[in-house]
């Protein structure tokens, strides 16, 4: 299989700078098990650092067993997702708003980007339900101190890309990492064909 000629060909376009609502895709050389082929949605990026959640790491723990009041709104497979290695005992919730819903001033919702919001898990699910297409709940998160993520991006550990609202709720059976790459322009889209098992290469 043909391989990229030069890793520098796959540096994120200048327009894609890290901010809330962007995604970090693990580059093919990032083989550390926690983040290999991971897709991280950036929730916060400011002077205090960066916080995001891994979108494609489902666990086997049912939402109902942890937060039963939110199980009805959770999208399939209705399990907790592993948001990252930090504070695994803490839960963070993202949702995609229905088209036309404005989250401004709504108790329990905090706008992230576009139709994506953070949901306060202490809120009443019944009050949130009419406004969202579904929720996804993460155990833990991924975090970087000031300058740490920038260093990893310069090292080409991460590809910075824009996100679609639908990316947040994609079912685990979909290879989200490859799907996002396939919709990018050449030559970046070539990375989508990179094998999951390196032994196949």
Curated annotation (Swiss-Prot):
Name the InterPro entries on file: AlgH-like
Name of this chain's protein = UPF0301 protein Mvan_6057
Q: What is the lineage of its organism?
A: Bacteria, Bacillati, Actinomycetota, Actinomycetes, Mycobacteriales
List cellular component terms (GO).
cytosol
Organism field: Mycolicibacterium vanbaalenii (strain DSM 7251 / JCM 13017 / BCRC 16820 / KCTC 9966 / NRRL B-24157 / PYR-1) (Mycobacterium vanbaalenii)
Q: Which HAMAP family match?
A: UPF0301
- Family matches, as Pfam families: DUF179
What protein family does this chain belong to?
Belongs to the UPF0301 (AlgH) family.
């Amino acid at each position: 299989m043909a391989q990229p000629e030069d890793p520098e060909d796959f540096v994120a376009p200048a327009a894609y700078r890290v901010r809330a609502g962007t995604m970090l895709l693990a580059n093919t050389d990032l083989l550390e098990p926690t983040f290999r082929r991971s897709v991280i949605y950036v929730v916060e990026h400011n002077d205090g650092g960066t916080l995001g959640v891994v979108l494609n790491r489902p666990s086997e723990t049912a939402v109902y067993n942890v937060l039963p009041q939110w199980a009805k709104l959770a999208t399939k497979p209705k399990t907790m997702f592993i948001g990252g290695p930090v504070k695994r005992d803490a839960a963070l919730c993202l949702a995609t708003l229905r088209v036309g819903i404005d989250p401004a001033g709504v108790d329990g919702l905090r706008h992230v980007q576009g139709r994506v919001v953070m949901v306060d898990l202490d809120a009443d699910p019944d009050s949130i339900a009419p406004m969202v297409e579904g929720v996804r709940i993460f155990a833990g998160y991924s975090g970087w101190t000031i300058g740490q993520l920038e260093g990893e991006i310069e090292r080409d550990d991460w590809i910075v890309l824009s996100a679609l609202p639908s990316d947040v709720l994609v079912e685990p059976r979909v290879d989200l990492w490859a799907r996002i790459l396939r919709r990018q322009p050449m030559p970046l889209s070539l990375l989508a064909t990179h094998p999951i098992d390196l032994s196949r290469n």
